[in-house]
């Protein structure tokens, strides 16, 4: 038992010894590990502290550098501003010095001028006293001279003044008359030159392509047998056609042709159209003739309207009343001294427009007035009154512009022109009518008119010779200078003009020129 206990005790002691050893070893191991961890932590902490110090040192240096840069920049700005202010102050000081010098010079100049003015004032005062003394002497002398003149001439002062005034007034009146005459001649010369330029330009830019109209129309036939069918049994067909149209049919020996004669172009056109339709159809009898005449009349009415619309389009005049357009188209079938009135109106419109453009007037209004100036001729054979009166009534009825109405009323001189456009229309009308080839007359009428023109001119006292020239558009009268003076020459021209207007019918205008010539001849021996 005791040995067992001893063994157990020994075993316990051994176990205890191993436990102590293991405990010591474990303690040492843990201590070593702890020390290693502490050393590692201390090293890491030291490393972090070193890094923080280095970073702080770096940031500090950067901050110091930034502060130094900012300080340097502020110092530079301050120095630059100081330099600029110093320069500006120096400039201001320099300017002030210059101004002071200028003021000093001005002050010196003013002082000199003041001295000069004082001297001049003294001189003027002296001269003033001398002038006053001289004026006093002159006044005394004038009084003495006036008294002497009144005594010698026997005229009072007022009478002498009146005589001098009359002489001066006469001299001024004479000089004024000469000046007025000179300026009037100059104005006329300038106006004539400018008007000739405008008229020549208008004529050059306006070309006429129409020819004189005739009073007959010719209808071609397929053969001469058709003439008998047109005449009809006992002439009933030709009588029906003449009765319905008012046109004379001339059927003679002219091969394959029938001549239509009549003064009314519209009726002649209706007859021509109807006859052509009858010839083409072949059925010719009174009933068919009446049908074709009615159809042709409607077609001609439509053609008239188309002519009116085409004319307004070509001329560039718009806004006309439809009835006025149709009346305008009727002018296509009207003639004046052989000149087609519609073509004449278009020509007048173009001429008036060109001249209005040159003078800065309303071109459209001038063209409108020129186109409508002869509108009364379209129906003057149907309505009583002259074509001027009828035209004014039509323009008023269809509410045309007052300038257009005045242009229609005044283009033949029946009414006074109230605008430049009215005058331009009258001039354009005269240009179109006077253009060579525009209008024609028979030879007998032409010769008789020229003889009558010279006869009227020679019927006045003091007329020596007369010459009708320019195809009767001008008459030149040579007068006796011992009977007709310059003033009477103007009156004679007006009197001859009035008598020509009263006794002659003529197209366009006639220029009356009175020539007075005085010759003084001497012979040197």
Swiss-Prot record:
Domain KH: 215-278
Keywords: Cell membrane, Endonuclease, Hydrolase, Membrane, Nuclease, RNA-binding, Transmembrane, Transmembrane helix
Signal peptide: none
Any single GO BP term: mRNA catabolic process
GO cellular component, one term: plasma membrane
Keyword Flavoprotein: no
GO molecular function: RNA binding; RNA endonuclease activity
Pfam families with a match to the protein in the record: HD, KH_1, RNase_Y_N
Protein's cellular compartments: Cell membrane
Transmembrane segments: 9-29
Domain HD intervals: 341-434
Family: Belongs to the RNase Y family.
Annotated function: Endoribonuclease that initiates mRNA decay.
Protein name in the entry: Ribonuclease Y
Species of provenance: Shouchella clausii (strain KSM-K16) (Alkalihalobacillus clausii)
Gene that this polypeptide is encoded by: rny
């Amino acid at each position: 038992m005791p040995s067992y206990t001893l063994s157990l005790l020994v075993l316990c002691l051994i176990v205890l010894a191993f436990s102590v050893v293991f405990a010591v070893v474990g303690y040492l191991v843990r201590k070593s590990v702890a020390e290693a961890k502490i050393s590692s932590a201390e090293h890491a902490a030291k490393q972090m502290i070193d890094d923080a110090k280095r970073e702080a040192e770096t940031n500090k240096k950067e901050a110091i550098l930034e502060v130094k840069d900012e300080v340097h920049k502020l110092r530079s700005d301050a120095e630059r501003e100081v330099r600029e202010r110093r320069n500006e102050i120096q400039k201001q000081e320099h300017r002030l010095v210059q101004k002071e010098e200028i003021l000093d010079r001005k002050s010196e100049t003013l002082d000199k001028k003041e001295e000069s003015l004082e001297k001049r004032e003294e001189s003027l005062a002296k001269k003033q006293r001398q002038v006053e003394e001289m004026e006093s002497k002159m006044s005394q002398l004038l009084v003495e001279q006036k008294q002497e003149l009144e005594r010698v001439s026997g005229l009072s002062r007022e009478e002498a003044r009146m005589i001098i005034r009359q002489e001066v007034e006469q001299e001024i009146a004479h000089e004024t008359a000469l000046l007025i005459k000179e300026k009037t001649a100059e104005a006329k010369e300038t106006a004539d030159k400018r008007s000739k330029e405008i008229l020549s330009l208008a004529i050059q830019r306006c070309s006429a392509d129409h020819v004189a109209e005739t009073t007959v129309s010719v209808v071609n036939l397929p053969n001469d047998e058709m003439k008998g069918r047109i005449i009809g049994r006992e002439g009933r067909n030709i009588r029906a056609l003449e009765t319905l149209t008012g046109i004379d049919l001339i059927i003679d020996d002219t091969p394959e042709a029938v001549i239509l004669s009549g003064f009314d172009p519209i009726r002649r056109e209706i007859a021509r159209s109807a006859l052509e339709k009858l010839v083409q159809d072949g059925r010719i009898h009174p009933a068919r003739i009446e049908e074709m005449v009615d159809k042709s009349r409607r077609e001609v009415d439509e053609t008239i309207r188309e002519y009116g619309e085409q004319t307004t389009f070509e001329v560039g005049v718009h806004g006309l009343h439809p009835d006025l357009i149709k009346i305008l188209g009727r002018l296509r079938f009207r003639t004046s001294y052989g000149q087609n009135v519609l073509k004449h109106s278009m020509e007048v419109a173009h001429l008036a427009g060109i001249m209005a453009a040159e003078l800065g007037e309303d071109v459209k209004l001038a063209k409108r007035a020129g186109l409508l100036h002869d509108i009364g001729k379209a129906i003057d054979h149907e309505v009583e009154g002259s074509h001027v009166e009828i035209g004014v009534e039509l323009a008023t009825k269809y509410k045309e512009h007052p300038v257009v109405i005045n242009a229609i009323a005044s283009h033949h001189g029946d009414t006074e022109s109230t605008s430049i456009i009215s005058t331009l229309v009258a001039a354009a009308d005269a240009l179109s009518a006077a253009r060579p080839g525009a209008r024609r007359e028979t030879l007998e009428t032409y010769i008789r008119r020229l003889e009558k023109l010279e006869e009227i001119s020679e019927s006045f006292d003091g007329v020596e010779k007369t010459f009708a020239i320019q195809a009767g558009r001008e008459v030149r009268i040579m007068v006796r200078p011992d009977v007709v003076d310059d003033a009477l020459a103007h009156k004679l021209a007006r009197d001859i003009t009035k008598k020509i207007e009263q006794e002659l019918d003529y197209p366009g205008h006639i220029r009356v020129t009175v020539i007075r010539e005085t010759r003084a001849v001497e012979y040197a021996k």
